[in-house]
């Protein structure tokens, strides 16, 4: 966990070092993009350990506004039994607003709504899965992005992911890379 936090802090520190070589084209060009994201999921108030989150997104930028669809996978082990896991898949529709200050770093905020499907395993054996494991999901997002080239953007963000059954939520720290067409 300490290594992940160190990696995130170093990643945030590197972009300003290279800001002098930043692209001179406008940051907020309109058009479609695709990307990958990954990070750590920190469960809120539960008996679960932190675990990985990975996923992909496809979206469209219109000036300061972005709309995207994202598919993510989460895996958290139980504190009492590391062989028992809670696994989740989410499919989210996200909307973002990018604050363009004509600077290399662009802060953004966003919200998302979608679907979460959760299931439990123990030693790889499926314990429960079915239609009762589907819930409405929602998230709030805040982060910062950096344009590496005219088409590539790196980002770091925090997300609060919740779902309607009221039995839990996740705090997510993620890094992303997007390629704009």
Swiss-Prot record:
- Signal peptide positions are 1-19
Classify the source by domain of life.
Bacteria
**GO terms for cellular component:** cell outer membrane
Which keywords does UniProt give here?
Cell outer membrane, Membrane, Signal, Transmembrane, Transmembrane beta strand
Q: Where in or outside the cell?
A: Cell outer membrane
Principal location listed in the UniProt entry: membrane
* InterPro entries referenced in this protein's UniProt entry, alphabetically: OM_autotransptr_brl_dom (IPR006315), OMP/PagP_b-brl (IPR011250), OMP_b-brl (IPR027385)
Q: Which family does it belong to?
A: Belongs to the opacity porin family.
Q: What is this protein called?
A: Uncharacterized protein CBU_1600
């Amino acid at each position: 966990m300490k290594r992940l936090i160190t990696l995130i802090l170093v990643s945030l520190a590197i972009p300003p070092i290279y800001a002098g070589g930043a692209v001179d084209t406008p940051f907020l060009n309109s058009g479609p993009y695709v990307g990958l994201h990954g990070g750590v999921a920190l469960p809120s108030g539960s008996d679960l350990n932190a675990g990985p989150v990975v996923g992909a997104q496809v979206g469209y930028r219109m000036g300061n506004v972005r709309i995207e669809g994202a598919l993510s996978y989460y895996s958290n082990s139980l504190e009492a039994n590391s062989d028992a896991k809670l696994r989740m898949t989410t499919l989210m529709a996200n909307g973002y607003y990018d604050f363009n200050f004509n600077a290399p770093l662009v802060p953004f905020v966003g919200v998302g709504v979608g679907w979460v499907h959760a299931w439990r395993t123990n030693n790889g054996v499926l314990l429960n899965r079915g239609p009762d494991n589907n819930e409405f999901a929602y998230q709030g997002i805040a982060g910062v992005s950096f344009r590496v080239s005219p088409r590539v953007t790196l980002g770091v963000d925090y997300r609060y992911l919740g779902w309607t059954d009221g039995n839990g939520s996740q705090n997510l720290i993620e890094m992303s890379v997007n390629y704009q067409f």
